[in-house]
């Protein structure tokens, strides 16, 4: 919104600063952070009044989790508020990619909100049926994927690039649409599975959003994209503002989610943030890089798949409990130890992911 003030540069030269993507990205970071800081306490108090006993705690989980009883959930509301306000305020809203990604994020947030609401009202950990949730996620992802493809240019809209290789792309044609939907739905559920300990998911999300903030800027800049020999996608630079908003909102939320958490993001936040990362990776043509940068989310998801498959096929469990973070808790690791070590893994994977921009 503020971008359009740059059109008045002829009258007020100082307004030219709103043309600069880096300035607006920084503004989005600070705005989203301030929104979370300012409105966070009020949102938490409101959630406490509405939820009473807070998020239901799994009876078969680690015993240390029983102390979390009464902690409100749906804290993702403050994240979405921060991201939404900051994006609308600082991004160039004439770019279709901004709307496609933002609306998908809010749509996934709505699915998560419904899931959290049912968990609270039914007083169990199930929420929406898995089938209904998946259908809603896939439906929204297909719409967003089609929108993104229509905004693209020629064959590039349906191409898949491989990291570490120069100019190696595959044109998937219309098969790219189900692939893009898979990326968005998969990323959404992967972050959701990771969100099981205080601060565990939000920091890796923040790290991944920071990486894609840079990627969006580079992909949207023809000079940098040519230098790095990565695909140039016009208009994607504005997603740096969106990713900056996620970083800022995540910092603000972490203030309240740091152990011991005052609030959980719930599916409201985790489904939305995962979907956002997936959508940005699709737009910037760095879907496989997301699997590297978000490798922690992949590990958590694979641990669940392996656990379920092993139990159904052999009757035995590979892990003491899935997702993976619960396995280490069951082995005796303290919750802060698990969280911080997983943060370190996320940082290492982010560095590896960034290296794909240059190592070709």
From Swiss-Prot:
Cell compartment(s), UniProt: Cell inner membrane
Enzyme Commission number, as recorded: 2.7.8.13
Membrane topology, as annotated: Multi-pass membrane protein
Transmembrane segments: 27-47, 73-93, 98-118, 134-154, 168-188, 199-219, 239-259, 263-283, 288-308, 337-357
Record key words, sorted: Cell cycle, Cell division, Cell inner membrane, Cell membrane, Cell shape, Cell wall biogenesis/degradation, Magnesium, Membrane, Metal-binding, Peptidoglycan synthesis, Transferase, Transmembrane, Transmembrane helix
GO function terms (MF aspect): metal ion binding; phospho-N-acetylmuramoyl-pentapeptide-transferase activity; UDP-N-acetylmuramoyl-L-alanyl-D-glutamyl-meso-2,6-diaminopimelyl-D-alanyl-D-alanine:undecaprenyl-phosphate transferase activity
Keyword Transferase: yes
HAMAP family in alphabetical order: MraY
Summary of the function given for this chain in its UniProt record: Catalyzes the initial step of the lipid cycle reactions in the biosynthesis of the cell wall peptidoglycan: transfers peptidoglycan precursor phospho-MurNAc-pentapeptide from UDP-MurNAc-pentapeptide onto the lipid carrier undecaprenyl phosphate, yielding undecaprenyl-pyrophosphoryl-MurNAc-pentapeptide, known as lipid I.
Name this protein carries in UniProt: Phospho-N-acetylmuramoyl-pentapeptide-transferase
Species this protein is from: Rhodospirillum rubrum (strain ATCC 11170 / ATH 1.1.1 / DSM 467 / LMG 4362 / NCIMB 8255 / S1)
């Amino acid at each position: 919104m503020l971008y359009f003030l740059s059109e008045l540069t002829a009258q007020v030269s100082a307004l030219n600063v709103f043309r600069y993507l880096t300035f607006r990205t920084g503004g989005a970071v600070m705005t989203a952070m301030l929104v979370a800081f300012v409105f966070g306490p009020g949102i938490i108090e409101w959630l406490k009044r509405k939820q009473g006993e807070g998020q239901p705690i799994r009876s078969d989980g680690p015993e240390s989790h029983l102390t979390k009883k009464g902690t409100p959930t749906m804290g993702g509301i403050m994240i979405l508020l921060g991201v939404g306000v900051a994006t609308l305020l600082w991004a160039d809203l004439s770019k279709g990619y901004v709307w496609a990604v933002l609306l998908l994020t809010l749509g996934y947030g709505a699915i998560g909100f419904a899931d959290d609401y049912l968990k609270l009202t039914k007083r169990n950990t199930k929420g929406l049926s898995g089938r209904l949730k998946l259908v809603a996620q896939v439906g929204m992802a297909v719409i967003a994927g089609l929108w993104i493809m229509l905004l693209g240019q020629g064959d590039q809209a349906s191409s898949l690039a491989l990291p570490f290789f120069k100019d190696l792309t595959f044109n998937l044609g219309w098969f790219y649409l189900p692939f893009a939907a898979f990326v968005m739905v998969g990323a959404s559920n992967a972050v959701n599975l990771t969100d099981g300990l205080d601060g565990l998911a939000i920091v890796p999300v923040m790290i991944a959003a920071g990486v894609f903030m840079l990627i969006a800027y580079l992909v949207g800049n023809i000079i940098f994209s040519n230098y790095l020999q990565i695909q140039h996608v016009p208009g994607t630079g504005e997603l740096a503002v969106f990713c900056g908003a996620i970083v800022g909102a995540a910092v603000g939320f972490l203030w309240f989610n740091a152990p011991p958490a005052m609030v959980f993001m719930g599916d409201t936040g985790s489904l939305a943030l995962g979907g956002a990362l997936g959508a940005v990776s699709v737009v910037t043509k760095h879907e496989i890089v997301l699997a590297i940068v978000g490798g922690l989310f992949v590990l958590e998801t694979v641990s669940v798949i392996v656990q379920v498959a092993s139990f159904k096929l052999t009757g035995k469990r590979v892990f003491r409990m899935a997702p993976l973070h619960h396995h280490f808790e069951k082995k005796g690791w303290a919750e802060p130890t698990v969280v911080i070590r997983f943060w370190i893994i996320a940082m290492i994977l982010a560095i590896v992911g960034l290296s794909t921009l240059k190592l070709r």
